[in-house]
């Protein structure tokens, strides 16, 4: 997790994020996303509860360092649904983004109720996930793929060509490709790729 984010974390949130990274084995990027989602939520809660000065300005300026168990215990399912509405209407978040934030909230409150036992009732236990549009995957035709490979030029043409071949033939994610090191290339012409959750594939 980024050090800058740690400095913004109240103790309860710092403990949770440490747990997800060290015990649950989530990647640093995933933990950062959890933090951003929870920070957005608690900034919203502080705003609707009148717990931040009017002069604070945009919610990006609202500190969550003072978020404690008393505030967390006051959260209701209705608060969360209003937050989801705020994300859609004010922040124009897509259903996919809202679904991720729903997951972040579910995991945090489950941690507090089932693991830490500091909450008697999980306010998001019955939280519905925003419905997501499911579209067909987009792909390049063979001609488009060939044209893309033929367009590679410049000082790093060989590297770029190899990267495109891996993208096209292996279906790698961007982070998976960026994470490949020389030691991942084996003498038997195979490649180890570390996927989400640091899983080898």
Each PLM stretch: what is its role?
Residues 1-201:
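Conserved catalytic core of the tyrosine transesterase superfamily
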């Amino acid at each position: 997790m980024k050090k800058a984010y740690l400095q913004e974390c109240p103790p309860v949130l710092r403990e949770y994020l440490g747990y997800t990274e060290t015990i649950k084995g989530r990647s640093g990027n995933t933990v950062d996303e959890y933090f951003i989602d929870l920070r957005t939520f608690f900034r919203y809660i502080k705003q609707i509860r009148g717990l931040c000065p009017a002069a604070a300005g945009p919610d990006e300026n609202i500190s969550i360092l003072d978020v404690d168990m008393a505030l967390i215990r006051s959260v209701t399912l209705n608060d969360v649904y209003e937050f989801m509405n705020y994300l859609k209407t004010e922040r124009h978040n897509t259903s996919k983004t809202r679904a991720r934030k729903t997951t972040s909230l579910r995991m945090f409150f489950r941690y507090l109720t089932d693991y830490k036992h500091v909450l008697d009732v999980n306010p998001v236990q019955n939280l519905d996930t925003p419905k997501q549009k499911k579209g067909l995957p987009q792909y390049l035709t063979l001609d488009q793929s060939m044209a893309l490979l033929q367009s590679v030029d410049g000082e790093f043409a060989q590297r770029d060509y190899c990267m495109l071949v891996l993208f096209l033939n292996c279906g790698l994610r961007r982070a998976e490709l960026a994470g490949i090191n020389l030691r991942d290339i084996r003498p038997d012409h195979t490649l180890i790729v570390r996927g989400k959750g640091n899983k080898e594939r």
